[in-house]
Amino acid sequence: RQVMAGLCFNEDCHCANAADTRRCLQEEAEKIAENIILKLPKLRKTLSTDVQAAFDGDPAAANLGEVIDCYPAIKALTNYRLAHELVLENVPLIPRMIAEMAHSETGIDIHPAATIGTHFTIDHGTGVVIGATCVIGM
Protein backbone atom coordinates (compact mmCIF):
# COMPACT_ATOMS: atom_id res chain seq x y z
CA ARG A 1 0.00 0.00 0.00
CA GLN A 2 2.78 2.45 0.85
CA VAL A 3 4.47 2.00 -2.52
CA MET A 4 1.14 2.58 -4.24
CA ALA A 5 0.58 5.70 -2.11
CA GLY A 6 3.98 6.98 -3.22
CA LEU A 7 3.19 6.25 -6.85
CA CYS A 8 0.14 8.51 -6.56
CA PHE A 9 2.62 11.41 -6.44
CA ASN A 10 4.03 10.37 -9.80
CA GLU A 11 2.38 12.11 -12.72
CA ASP A 12 3.60 9.62 -15.33
CA CYS A 13 0.45 7.48 -15.33
CA HIS A 14 -1.73 8.45 -18.29
CA CYS A 15 -4.60 5.99 -17.97
CA ALA A 16 -7.97 6.72 -19.53
CA ASN A 17 -9.98 6.95 -16.31
CA ALA A 18 -9.71 6.78 -12.54
CA ALA A 19 -10.43 3.03 -12.36
CA ASP A 20 -7.71 2.32 -14.93
CA THR A 21 -5.31 4.58 -13.06
CA ARG A 22 -5.92 2.73 -9.79
CA ARG A 23 -5.44 -0.66 -11.46
CA CYS A 24 -2.32 0.58 -13.25
CA LEU A 25 -0.84 1.94 -10.00
CA GLN A 26 -1.72 -1.23 -8.09
CA GLU A 27 -0.03 -3.45 -10.68
CA GLU A 28 3.07 -1.25 -10.71
CA ALA A 29 3.20 -1.16 -6.89
CA GLU A 30 2.94 -4.95 -6.69
CA LYS A 31 5.75 -5.35 -9.22
CA ILE A 32 7.96 -2.92 -7.30
CA ALA A 33 7.20 -4.60 -3.96
CA GLU A 34 8.09 -7.97 -5.46
CA ASN A 35 11.37 -6.57 -6.81
CA ILE A 36 12.25 -5.12 -3.40
CA ILE A 37 11.45 -8.43 -1.67
CA LEU A 38 13.76 -10.23 -4.10
CA LYS A 39 16.54 -7.77 -3.22
CA LEU A 40 16.25 -8.28 0.56
CA PRO A 41 18.91 -11.03 0.81
CA LYS A 42 21.45 -8.81 -0.97
CA LEU A 43 20.39 -5.85 1.16
CA ARG A 44 20.90 -7.91 4.32
CA LYS A 45 24.37 -8.94 3.15
CA THR A 46 25.32 -5.34 2.40
CA LEU A 47 24.07 -4.22 5.82
CA SER A 48 26.13 -6.96 7.46
CA THR A 49 29.24 -5.47 5.82
CA ASP A 50 28.28 -2.07 7.27
CA VAL A 51 27.91 -3.59 10.74
CA GLN A 52 31.28 -5.32 10.38
CA ALA A 53 32.90 -2.06 9.23
CA ALA A 54 31.54 -0.25 12.30
CA PHE A 55 32.75 -3.03 14.59
CA ASP A 56 36.19 -3.27 12.97
CA GLY A 57 36.67 0.50 12.96
CA ASP A 58 35.65 1.21 16.53
CA PRO A 59 37.82 -0.14 19.34
CA ALA A 60 35.03 0.76 21.78
CA ALA A 61 32.60 -1.68 20.14
CA ALA A 62 32.13 -4.67 22.43
CA ASN A 63 30.36 -6.95 19.93
CA LEU A 64 28.25 -6.99 16.77
CA GLY A 65 25.01 -6.96 18.75
CA GLU A 66 25.99 -3.69 20.38
CA VAL A 67 26.76 -2.21 16.95
CA ILE A 68 23.40 -3.33 15.54
CA ASP A 69 21.35 -2.15 18.52
CA CYS A 70 23.19 0.97 19.63
CA TYR A 71 24.98 2.63 16.73
CA PRO A 72 23.00 5.43 15.05
CA ALA A 73 24.89 4.91 11.79
CA ILE A 74 23.39 1.43 11.44
CA LYS A 75 19.87 2.86 11.78
CA ALA A 76 20.66 5.56 9.22
CA LEU A 77 22.30 3.12 6.80
CA THR A 78 19.47 0.59 7.13
CA ASN A 79 16.92 3.24 6.24
CA TYR A 80 19.15 4.62 3.48
CA ARG A 81 19.73 1.22 1.86
CA LEU A 82 16.01 0.39 1.75
CA ALA A 83 15.12 3.90 0.56
CA HIS A 84 17.84 3.70 -2.11
CA GLU A 85 16.30 0.51 -3.52
CA LEU A 86 12.97 2.33 -3.75
CA VAL A 87 14.70 5.21 -5.58
CA LEU A 88 16.12 2.70 -8.06
CA GLU A 89 12.54 1.50 -8.64
CA ASN A 90 11.46 5.13 -9.30
CA VAL A 91 9.16 5.31 -6.29
CA PRO A 92 8.51 8.97 -5.47
CA LEU A 93 8.26 10.50 -1.97
CA ILE A 94 8.45 7.30 0.13
CA PRO A 95 12.28 7.05 -0.02
CA ARG A 96 12.62 10.62 1.25
CA MET A 97 10.20 9.89 4.09
CA ILE A 98 12.20 6.81 5.11
CA ALA A 99 15.45 8.79 5.01
CA GLU A 100 13.92 11.61 7.05
CA MET A 101 12.78 9.17 9.74
CA ALA A 102 16.41 8.13 10.25
CA HIS A 103 17.59 11.74 10.06
CA SER A 104 15.23 12.82 12.84
CA GLU A 105 16.24 9.86 15.02
CA THR A 106 20.00 9.90 14.42
CA GLY A 107 21.01 13.33 13.15
CA ILE A 108 22.53 11.62 10.10
CA ASP A 109 21.05 12.88 6.83
CA ILE A 110 21.61 10.52 3.89
CA HIS A 111 19.72 11.32 0.70
CA PRO A 112 18.25 8.10 -0.73
CA ALA A 113 19.60 8.91 -4.21
CA ALA A 114 23.22 8.96 -2.95
CA THR A 115 25.40 6.02 -3.97
CA ILE A 116 27.22 4.27 -1.12
CA GLY A 117 29.26 1.10 -1.49
CA THR A 118 29.60 -1.77 0.96
CA HIS A 119 31.61 -1.86 4.21
CA PHE A 120 30.55 1.69 5.06
CA THR A 121 30.07 3.28 8.44
CA ILE A 122 29.81 6.71 10.03
CA ASP A 123 31.36 7.18 13.47
CA HIS A 124 29.90 9.98 15.61
CA GLY A 125 27.60 10.93 12.76
CA THR A 126 25.40 13.67 14.20
CA GLY A 127 25.35 16.47 11.64
CA VAL A 128 26.66 14.37 8.75
CA VAL A 129 24.94 15.16 5.46
CA ILE A 130 25.36 12.96 2.38
CA GLY A 131 23.68 14.56 -0.63
CA ALA A 132 21.85 13.07 -3.58
CA THR A 133 24.80 13.37 -5.97
CA CYS A 134 27.35 11.93 -3.57
CA VAL A 135 29.16 8.73 -4.58
CA ILE A 136 31.07 6.92 -1.82
CA GLY A 137 33.05 3.75 -2.31
CA MET A 138 31.96 2.85 -5.81
What spans do the regions from the language model cover?
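Terminal amphipathic alpha-helical/low-complexity segments used for targeting or macromolecular assembly
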Residues: 1-100
